[in-house]
Amino acid sequence: MACPLDQAIGLLVAIFHKYSGKEGDKHTLSKKELKELIQKELTIGAKLQDAEIARLMDDLDRNKDQEVNFQEYVAFLGALALIYNEALK
């Protein structure tokens, strides 16, 4: 039986792969794929405008290849975790 943290990490990985590769490289998220992931998997996603998602994509895309790789996605999750932690204080 997997521990809750194992399950949570597995879910984060599975969500990345659920959206990556719908178009182009199956190991990265395009802008369209990232937008869909954010809008469907995060409560705040429905509230974000296209310009905000584009700005987020630009911030996440450290190597400027117009895609978000898994490492960049993990950095995004880390930033989200910090925000959630602050909200709980």
Curated annotation (Swiss-Prot):
CDD domains: S-100A6
PTM annotation (N6-acetyllysine): residues: K40, K47
Positions contributing to Ca(2+) 2 binding: D61, N63, D65, E67, E72
Ranges for domain EF-hand: 12-47, 48-83
GO molecular function, one term: tropomyosin binding
Pfam families registered for this protein in UniProt: S_100 (PF01023)
Binding site for Ca(2+) 1: T28, E33
Protein keywords: Acetylation, Calcium, Cell membrane, Cytoplasm, Membrane, Metal-binding, Nucleus, Repeat
Subcellular localization: Nucleus envelope; Cytoplasm; Cell membrane
The protein's assembly and partners: Homodimer; head to tail assembly of 2 subunits. Interacts with CACYBP in a calcium-dependent manner. Interacts with ANXA2 and ANXA11 (via N-terminus). Interacts with SUGT1. Interacts with TP53; has higher affinity for TP53 that is phosphorylated on its N-terminal domain, and lower affinity for TP53 that is phosphorylated on its C-terminal domain. Interacts with tropomyosin. Interacts with FKBP4. Interacts with PPP5C (via TPR repeats); the interaction is calcium-dependent and modulates PPP5C activity. Interacts with TPPP; this interaction inhibits TPPP dimerization.
Additional facts recorded: This protein co-purified with the prolactin receptor.
Annotated protein name in UniProt: Protein S100-A6
